[in-house]
Each structure stands twice: as structure tokens, then as C-alpha cells.
């Protein structure tokens, strides 16, 4: 692997595209051309043809289901398989929570009330400075504290 000193040569031979003005001193970076030269292979240019179905049909008015996709996959006209009382319950009590704002307010009120309850029922002696000494003090070597 070539070091940076061999890549950034003093004599300009080929400029690195995109790195010309990136040096801190303001000098341009140059590299020596490689010893191997890669020859590009000539390729034939051809037209790209995208096909939908037969005979290059891209939009078929006769078959809109396959052209635009099936939009009624999840729709159903069948009656609800759930109990009517259960359906009425969820339509009545879950309807306010379908809107994002109401759901957010409910979550904020619930979280605030939970924090209030926890802070009211917690004990304040969590820190050792508030609890005070837990054991009687030990006397020193001369019988003093």
C-alpha cells in the first residue's frame, strides 16, 4: 500500500479530482499515474425496453385491477363477526382515542397522575444524609469520637 508521501508528489503529473484544494497549506494534491493502464471495453449501446404484459402495454384500461392494484383487499361488506354489544362498547368508549390529540392528553394526564401518586407515597429518607446514622458511633483509639 502506498504511503501518503508517495501519493502527494512534488511534481504534478495527474491531479486528484475533488481533492485539489483540500490541503491545509493550500497546495494541491497530485498523484502519479499507475503503471498499469486499464483499457475500457467497447460495449454496444442498445435501447432498454420495459414491458408490462404482452405487446409493451403499460396501462390497460380493460384490466384496471392488475394495472393499478387491488384496492379493496381489506374492505369487506360482510357483517361484523363480533358481538353487537361488544361492538357498541368499543365504538362508544374507544372513539375519543382515535384522534391523536385526545390520546396524547390522556397519556399526559395518566403519566402526571402516576408521578403524583408515586411522589406522594414515597419516603423522603432515600439519601444517607437524610436518614442519619444507622449504627452507634465507634470510639477511637483513645476512647473519643
UniProtKB/Swiss-Prot annotation:
Q: Which GO terms describe its biological process?
A: photosynthesis
Q: Which residue stretches belong to region Disordered?
A: 126-145
GO cellular component assignments: chloroplast; chloroplast thylakoid; chloroplast thylakoid membrane; nucleus; photosystem I reaction center; thylakoid
Gene that specifies this protein: PSAH2
Which InterPro entries is this protein grouped with? PSI_PsaH
- The UniProt transmembrane annotation reads 102-118
Protein family membership: Belongs to the psaH family.
Q: Where does this one sit in the cell?
A: Plastid, Chloroplast thylakoid membrane
Transit peptide, first to last residue? 1-50
Q: What does this protein do?
A: Possible role could be the docking of the LHC I antenna complex to the core complex.
Where does this chain mainly localize? plastid
Keywords for this protein: Chloroplast, Membrane, Photosynthesis, Photosystem I, Plastid, Thylakoid, Transit peptide, Transmembrane, Transmembrane helix
Topology in the membrane? Single-pass membrane protein
The molecule here is called Photosystem I reaction center subunit VI-2, chloroplastic
Q: Entry's Gene3D superfamilies?
A: 1.20.5.220
> From which domain of life does this come?
Eukaryota
One Pfam family it belongs to: PSI_PsaH
Amino acid at each position: 500500500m502506498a504511503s501518503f508521501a508517495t501519493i502527494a508528489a512534488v511534481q504534478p503529473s495527474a491531479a486528484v479530482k475533488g481533492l485539489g484544494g483540500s490541503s491545509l497549506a493550500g497546495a494541491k494534491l497530485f498523484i502519479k499515474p499507475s503503471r498499469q493502464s486499464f483499457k475500457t471495453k467497447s460495449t454496444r449501446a442498445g435501447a432498454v425496453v420495459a414491458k408490462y404484459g404482452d405487446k409493451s402495454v403499460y396501462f390497460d384500461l380493460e384490466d384496471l385491477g392488475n394495472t393499478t392494484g387491488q384496492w379493496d383487499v381489506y374492505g369487506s361488506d360482510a357483517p361484523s363477526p363480533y358481538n353487537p354489544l361488544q361492538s357498541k362498547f368499543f365504538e362508544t368508549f374507544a372513539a375519543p382515542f382515535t384522534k391523536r390529540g385526545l390520546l396524547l392528553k390522556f397519556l399526559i394526564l395518566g403519566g402526571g397522575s402516576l408521578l403524583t401518586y408515586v411522589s406522594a407515597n414515597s419516603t423522603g429518607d432515600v439519601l444517607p444524609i437524610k436518614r442519619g446514622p444507622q449504627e452507634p458511633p465507634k470510639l477511637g483509639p483513645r476512647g473519643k469520637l
